């Protein structure tokens, strides 16, 4: 596995391989890899000749009071995991490599990016869309892989690709979970033992949503209220977003029919946990790009 920090050097290497007819898959990450990331890598390895994994903690997607400075980092560990997994190239630029001058250009999807998680993290999704757009321009992959834990992010990136006619197929991969159902996340390392035990309320709330819908509940506002009440059983959990949306568009729904996504954004202690579940048939995340095959694994 070769490691790059230079945009020009990576481009030069990939251009030569593409001229040989090799197709390229990209897995964008912020590092501190876990089994969920490695599932993305495995999917990319199975479907592409060349796999590029990027590790970049993107300052544009962090608010001023968020955890940019303490976000977990261990590039040596990550590189060893990726090498063992058969990744061809690791792109690990510094901030100066990605943003040599202050950014004057921003990619924004105003409606989608200001809803749900975007409502409590202003500017977050503009930062995500901007860095992903730049990574797509640098690597120019045929396919790119994202985890469904970040469901809203997948919808936004697919919409960006469609609106801007970016020739990249966006593939979403099911969420990987611990044995008790908690979605794997690099930020789980922040949880104390007590908070980690409390965090199981998040996947349990998704189970409760599925049960309530299965029992015939169809009013979205009633479901949101019941799920908020359910989360309140755990004193360490503070719900910030409890929402039922159309699974394809993320538009609000009043009546539950077809496919909906139940989206949760819950603070446990000082750590924000993000999770979701799609309930219903015929799911298509964000439109035309190819979705994953499920939500849990």
UniProtKB/Swiss-Prot annotation:
HAMAP family: PanC
Alphabetical list of Gene3D superfamilies matching this protein: HUPs, Pantoate-beta-alanine ligase, C-terminal domain
Chemical reaction(s) catalysed: (R)-pantoate + beta-alanine + ATP = (R)-pantothenate + AMP + diphosphate + H(+)
Disulfide bonds: none
Protein name, entry field: Pantothenate synthetase
Pathway: Cofactor biosynthesis; (R)-pantothenate biosynthesis; (R)-pantothenate from (R)-pantoate and beta-alanine: step 1/1
Gene: panC
Keyword terms, alphabetized: ATP-binding, Cytoplasm, Ligase, Nucleotide-binding, Pantothenate biosynthesis, Plasmid
Catalytic residues (UniProt): 37
Organism taxonomic ancestry: Bacteria, Pseudomonadati, Pseudomonadota, Alphaproteobacteria, Hyphomicrobiales
Quaternary structure, from the entry: Homodimer.
Function according to Swiss-Prot or TrEMBL: Catalyzes the condensation of pantoate with beta-alanine in an ATP-dependent reaction via a pantoyl-adenylate intermediate.
NCBIfam families: cyt_tran_rel, panC
Record-listed ATP binding positions: 30-37, 147-150, 176, 184-187
Top-level taxon: Bacteria
Gene Ontology BP, a term: pantothenate biosynthetic process
GO cellular component annotations of the record: cytosol
UniProt record similarity statement: Belongs to the pantothenate synthetase family.
Annotated localization: Cytoplasm
GO MF annotation terms: ATP binding; pantoate-beta-alanine ligase activity
